[in-house]
Every structure is written in structure tokens, then in C-alpha cells.
Amino acid sequence: MLILISPAKTLDYQSPLATTRYTQPELLDHSQQLIQQARQLSAPQISRLMGISDKLADLNATRFHDWQPHFTPDNARQAILAFKGDVYTGLQAETFNDADFDFAQQHLRMLSGLYGVLRPLDLMQPYRLEMGIRLENPRGKDLYQFWGDIITDKLNEALEAQGDRVVVNLASEEYFKSVKPKKLNAELIKPVFLDEKNGKFKVVSFYAKKARGLMSRFIIENRLTKPEQLIAFDREGYFFDEETSTQDELVFKRYEQ
């Protein structure tokens, strides 16, 4: 079983590390090509392209400039411990033990605009380059054209290595669009998280993101390997709703608190 999640805009390079183990990202040659493109942008261009403030644009122009292909624990941090958005609040990787990191390294992948695919312990230098950004590059007009089949091929390698054909898609639409489902050698399962609001169940972005992290942690902690095991997920009040679920879309609901 391979779990896919999105990266986060918020990064943490300060907190104590939960592990000193690390690996190197596998697609750095491609990342370097994107960095070369990004370095051609001025801070005002970055601001317009990403829709961010001048201050953030300056920070990211500096990050692109400072980025170097030789990753060490001094200039980089394990991806699963560097990302700090809502998904990662649910995941709480900072509390993983060695066995959790082992399982996650084999079964969890983070999709990334700059790095393509990251394993949890892959070192990562700080960046901001969302998958949906229209950064022109030698391969096309955006990052989807840049990555092409590369991300899908890397996921197929991971599936082959673990010997099964199940992908649990906990990534956002923006990021999963970088994967080619028809070329993926796997059964695709998408958990959906609905929260009750004024008597109706709907996707509430903040809660849904955190729930994706909670589900990822549930799979990792319990060493789940079969799709049917996912329906036992019951963290923070969620329950499986068989009536509205299908074989490839598992619906989890939570009543208003």
C-alpha cells in the first residue's frame, strides 16, 4: 500500500529532529533544472507568479539562489519533519518511533512541485513551488508538463518494491494531477472526509486536510497493507459511512461537535 500526500507551504527547520536518519531525494537532476528556471525570476515576478507578498517573494528568491544540489543535514532536513501544514498536524511525524519511520519510508510518498516525489526521510532544502504554478520550462508551460510521466514512474517503482498494487490517494487535486492514473500499476482508493455543518455533511478544507494526516498516521501506526483495513479509521470522531462509499471512494463522516 502506497500513501500519497501533498507537501505544505509552512516549513519548520528549527524544531528538534525526531530522527537523525536520512536519505537523498531520487529526482534531484530534475529539481536542479527547475531551480535554474526559477533563478531567472526576479522577486516581483515570483510575487506575481505565486500570488504572494513581496516579503515572501524575497524569501523565495533567496531560497532559489541558495539552493545547492549537495544535500547534507546542515543545509537540509528530512521532508516529513520539514513540512508543517494541516496534513502534517494530523500526521505528527515528530512523535514517530524508528519502526514508524521504517514503515513510512516504504509506504508514504509526498508529491512536490520541486522534488517530484519525496520519501519521508529524504533530505529537503527549503522551497516554495506549488505544483499548480505556471512556471514555463524547457518541457512545457507548467510543472505538470515538466514532470510528465516521471512521478508516475517513480510511484510504480515503489509499488513494485513493496509487492502490492494499492495507492491510497490522500493528496489534494492540485498535486494528484501530477500522477497519471491510467499508467499507475495500482488500484486507486480515495478517502473522503466530511464534517457536519448545520445538519449537512460537506468537505471543510481545514478539517479534511488534518484528517488526511490522521489517516496517514493510522495506516503507519497500524502497519496496514490491505484496503479493507482502512474502514476501521475512527480518529477524532470520524466514522466510515458504508452507504455513501464506493469501492474506490471511502467516505468518512464526523458529526458537528
Swiss-Prot record:
Encoding gene, per UniProt annotation: yaaA
A biological-process GO annotation: response to hydroperoxide
Region forming the signal peptide: none
Organism: Salmonella agona (strain SL483)
Cellular component terms per the entry's GO annotation: cytosol
Pfam family, one: H2O2_YaaD
Family affiliation: Belongs to the UPF0246 family.
Protein name: UPF0246 protein YaaA
Superkingdom classification of source: Bacteria
InterPro entries attached to this UniProt entry: YaaA
